[in-house]
Amino acid sequence: MATPFLPSGATTGDSGGELSSGDDSGDMESFQTPEAEGTRSLAELFEKAAAHVQGLVQVASREQLLYLYARFKQVKVGNCNTPKPNFFDFEGKQKWEAWKALGDSSPSQAMQEYIAAVKKLDPGWNPQVSEKKGKEGSSGFGGPVVSSLYHEETIREEDKNIFDYCRENNIDHIAKAIKSKAADVNMTDEEGRALLHWACDRGHKELVKVLLQYEAGINCQDNEGQTALHYAAACEFLDIVELLLQSGADPTLRDQDGCLPEEVTGCKAVSLLLQRHRASKA
């Protein structure tokens, strides 16, 4: 569920059309022959290309990153289904426009173009060679121990948005952006996650304090119905759970699966704290 400049696995490409599926049919044929790939499906090749991208981010242009971002989203999500980002989110608007421009493009076409783009970037890439992988997870944000399910990317300074600075715990940058109104403290990413969700997910207690001082919506729910309290509980940050409760977080709000914050944690201390607080408010 991830959202920074590239989703986990996105690679580079060319927004000028050089990497269209029609122009690169030769590349695709070489990938899909039984001799070269055995029984690998197009989807498996796409996943391998996505894994390979992590080592190519630094050599890719902004246009290439946007090209691949859009196709990754088309494969994983489908047609663009999110509102256009606000005026101040310049990078977010570029990403949204690149994705939106694909219209009703099929996942198959998007995968073909994505794979061809990776081949253009690294002609020597061999998808039969396994990529080194970090922590993996099936659902990303919103599941147990959220951070462990989120793949980090290397993002160049000029490509960062407010959520990237939040991940990095860059309190000064975030405070200045909010104070100057360059960013709204309650702005959300495409998954409905606000800055407070991100800060709680990463365990950045001091940043959580700053966001609350700027009146972050403490009970704001993401697209899965999870609050910042769900995130802090799932990641087992007891001190942040305490801070949120002291600041007025509602432990009775349930996510779309019907789970309370106390039910998404594997930490007994966190669960007991939430239960006691909820009981005291009953």
Swiss-Prot record:
Annotated residues that bind an acyl-CoA are located at Y69, A70, R71, F72, K73, K95, Y114
PROSITE patterns from the UniProt entry: ACB_2, ANK_REP_REGION, ANK_REPEAT
Region Disordered, residue ranges: 1-39
GO cellular component terms?
A: cytoplasm; nucleus
Question: Which keywords appear in this protein's UniProt record, sorted alphabetically?
Answer: ANK repeat, Cytoplasm, Lipid-binding, Nucleus, Phosphoprotein, Repeat
Which positions carry Phosphoserine? S41, S106
**Which segments constitute the ACB domain?**
42-127
Query: What InterPro entries does this protein's entry cite?
Result: Acyl-CoA-binding_protein, Acyl-CoA-binding_sf, Ankyrin_rpt, Ankyrin_rpt-contain_sf, FERM/acyl-CoA-bd_prot_sf
Disulfide partners: none
Tell me the compartments it is located in.
Answer: Cytoplasm; Nucleus
* MF GO annotations: fatty-acyl-CoA binding; lipid binding
Q: Which segments carry the ANK repeats? A: 191-220, 224-253
Keyword Coiled coil listed? The answer is no
What Pfam family is a match for this entry? Ank_2
What is the protein's known function? Binds long-chain acyl-coenzyme A molecules with a strong preference for unsaturated C18:1-CoA, lower affinity for unsaturated C20:4-CoA, and very weak affinity for saturated C16:0-CoA. Does not bind fatty acids. Plays a role in protein N-myristoylation.
How does this chain assemble? Answer: Monomer.
Question: Can you name this protein?
Answer: Acyl-CoA-binding domain-containing protein 6
